[in-house]
């Protein structure tokens, strides 16, 4: 459980650093200065965790927590395997931008399907599930835009982090719920 708590705290830090650098690049671009400042401000909002919502304790709390943790672990294992596979293909010279994009789109669909398959019994569990799903829905839109782009670039680079607050909020809500249930 301690390993999971550390992972829940570490993952958002890494993601924040990655996406903050994207925001800085977008904000420092010489074109459309006023628009970039607005985009950077919007992006900062997308990186903030919403307040923890209170939910009543139920007999099914442990069940839902375990399912959400299992989902997170399975997704992370799948994502690690995908990254290793992509790296291997890159090293072998077999990775094309189209193939990489397709594999990442497949990963997003898998995350969404895994979430849909969760048999959550509590309001809090379904709330967390919904936050995760909203995040993955946005990622699906980002990859679709990239697929349609002629230069493999997003029209608005900050679109890539839209909805990150949903992901961070889901992680924080789950961690809070775990701590609350452990008491």
Where are each of the predicted segments found?
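Ser/Thr/Pro/Gly-rich low-complexity linker/stalk segments immediately outside membranes or between
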Residues: 33-36
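Short, solvent-exposed, charged loop/turn and helix-capping segments
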Residues: 98, 105-133, 182-183
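C-terminal amphipathic alpha-helix
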Residues: 40-102, 135-183
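C-terminal motif of bacterial Sec signal peptides marking the signal peptidase cleavage site
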Residues: 24-27
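Bacterial signal peptide processing site
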Residues: 29-31
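Bacterial N-terminal signal peptides that target proteins for export
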Residues: 5-17
